[in-house]
């Protein structure tokens, strides 16, 4: 594990070079391909070295982090062309990648907590440094307060786990039985806010709307998945309590997902719509993890990977339109098929992947999550029907409203898009649909 970490760390001095943008980009791509072929054990921890090691769950999420960070650099080439501190931007992306790499590969719960929290700092830098509106300061405050206040109780829980077991080394931890209810709440509350669960989701649309494209991609692609990964790890310690209390979180998130789907119908801001749809998808992931069965955990992994790639691609599409027309409003970005006909196919492909139509990885994830939630309680089937149906409705609403109809009369001319943009969208769509063909990787 350390060899990959050191390769990322030694990319940082390259940022001091005058023209490092595409060099760092190519080297992270190379690293992701080397890392891809390195896993040799599906079920056990492998590549263990000095409190770092991966199992299959963290391996897939590290791979997703490397992939999304490459695509962030590709998508943000307007920073490179305008020479708005491109070297510092690459440095922040590398710093964020190091934090994410260490979070997903930490075998000590305390070091996981430290890296989990410190991944907020580079994200805040991205929002404050390269965001668009002055309101980005408020979005940054929302982001910090929601996530930091929610995760302080988790620190107390880690100290008490250390008291009980005299270690925080993950493979040595066991379930400590029926402790008390607050212990359970504090353990998972930080991760539920990060996901985010309904009622604590207000920071997410705010952060997305104010963030640059790179910030939106990393938020939707990886940082929400940190919450799911944290719940998966903590379930080992609180599974006995989970049997008693999981029904409450599961019901809240599923009911919240349906309400958020209704909120999506009311959105006219493209970014805001995609951000709210992330909350609806993550509610399914929370439910899968809370059922604590094999279908649920593996389904939530495949939906996290699928959603990370597809929503990142949708944010790229909204940014392409924003850079061309200077607006994210659906009232102005309508009838785009008349102006950018070849971009419409990418809108369709990524929208269909986002609503879990075949052959995307989201379909595998949603099937297994439906399986696990209905096996947990057959009464949930009504809410699941609503959630699946409405997710298709608001995605099709976004696609048809933005692509079809008359174009806005104030738009006189529009570029068809650059090769870089089509290449970027292909690199989102291709792994998303390729992984569906190898679904057995997720259900070993």
Swiss-Prot record:
Record keywords: Ubl conjugation included?
A: no
| MF-aspect GO terms | NADH dehydrogenase (ubiquinone) activity; ubiquinone binding
Q: Which reaction does it catalyse?
A: a ubiquinone + NADH + 5 H(+)(in) = a ubiquinol + NAD(+) + 4 H(+)(out)
User: Membrane-spanning residues where?
Assistant: 4-24, 28-48, 53-73, 87-107, 109-129, 141-161, 173-193, 212-232, 245-265, 272-294, 306-326, 330-350, 373-393
- Give a short account of what the protein does: Core subunit of the mitochondrial membrane respiratory chain NADH dehydrogenase (Complex I) that is believed to belong to the minimal assembly required for catalysis. Complex I functions in the transfer of electrons from NADH to the respiratory chain. The immediate electron acceptor for the enzyme is believed to be ubiquinone.
PANTHER family xrefs: NADH-UBIQUINONE OXIDOREDUCTASE CHAIN 4
Protein known as: NADH-ubiquinone oxidoreductase chain 4
Species annotation: Locusta migratoria (Migratory locust)
């Amino acid at each position: 594990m350390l060899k990959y970490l050191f390769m990322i760390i030694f990319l940082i001095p390259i940022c001091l070079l005058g023209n490092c943008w595409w060099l760092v980009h190519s080297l992270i791509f190379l690293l992701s391909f080397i890392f891809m072929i390195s896993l040799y054990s599906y079920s056990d921890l492998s590549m263990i070295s000095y409190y770092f090691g991966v199992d299959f769950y963290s391996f897939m999420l590290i791979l997703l982090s490397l992939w999304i960070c490459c695509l962030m650099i590709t998508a943000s080439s307007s920073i490179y062309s305008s020479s708005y501190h491109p070297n510092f931007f690459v440095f922040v992306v590398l710093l964020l990648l190091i934090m994410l790499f260490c979070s997903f590969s930490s075998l000590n719960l305390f070091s996981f907590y430290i890296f989990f929290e410190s991944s907020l700092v580079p994200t805040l830098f991205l929002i404050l440094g390269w965001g668009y509106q002055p309101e980005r300061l408020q979005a940054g405050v929302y982001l910090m307060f929601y996530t930091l206040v929610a995760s302080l109780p988790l620190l107390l829980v880690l100290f008490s786990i250390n008291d009980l077991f005299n270690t925080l080394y993950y493979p040595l931890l066991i379930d400590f039985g029926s402790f008390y209810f607050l212990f359970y709440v504090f353990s998972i509350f930080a991760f539920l806010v990060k996901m985010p669960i309904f009622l604590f989701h207000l920071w997410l649309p705010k952060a997305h709307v104010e963030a640059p494209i790179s910030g939106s991609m990393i938020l939707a692609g990886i940082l929400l998945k940190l919450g799911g990964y944290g719940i998966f790890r903590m379930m080992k310690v609180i599974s006995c309590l989970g049997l008693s209390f999981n029904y409450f979180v599961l019901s809240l998130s599923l009911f919240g997902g349906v309400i958020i789907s209704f909120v999506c119908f009311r959105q006219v801001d493209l970014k805001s719509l995609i951000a709210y749809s992330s909350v609806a998808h993550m509610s399914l992931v929370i439910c899968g993890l809370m059922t604590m069965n094999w279908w649920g955990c593996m389904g939530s992994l495949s939906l996290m990977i699928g959603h990370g790639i597809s929503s990142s691609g949708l944010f790229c599409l909204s940014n392409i339109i924003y850079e061309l027309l200077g607006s994210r409003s659906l009232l102005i970005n309508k009838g785009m098929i008349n102006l950018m006909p070849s971009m419409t196919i990418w809108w369709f492909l990524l929208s269909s992947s986002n609503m879990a139509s075949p052959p995307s990885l989201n379909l595998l994830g949603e099937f297994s999550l439906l399986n696990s939630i209905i096996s947990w309680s057959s009464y949930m089937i009504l809410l699941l029907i609503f959630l699946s149906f409405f997710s298709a409705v608001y995605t099709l609403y976004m696609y048809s409203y933005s692509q079809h109809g008359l174009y806005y009369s104030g738009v006189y001319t529009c570029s068809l898009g650059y090769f870089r943009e089509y290449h970027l969208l292909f690199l989102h769509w291709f792994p998303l649909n390729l992984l569906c063909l190898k679904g057995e990787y997720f259900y070993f």
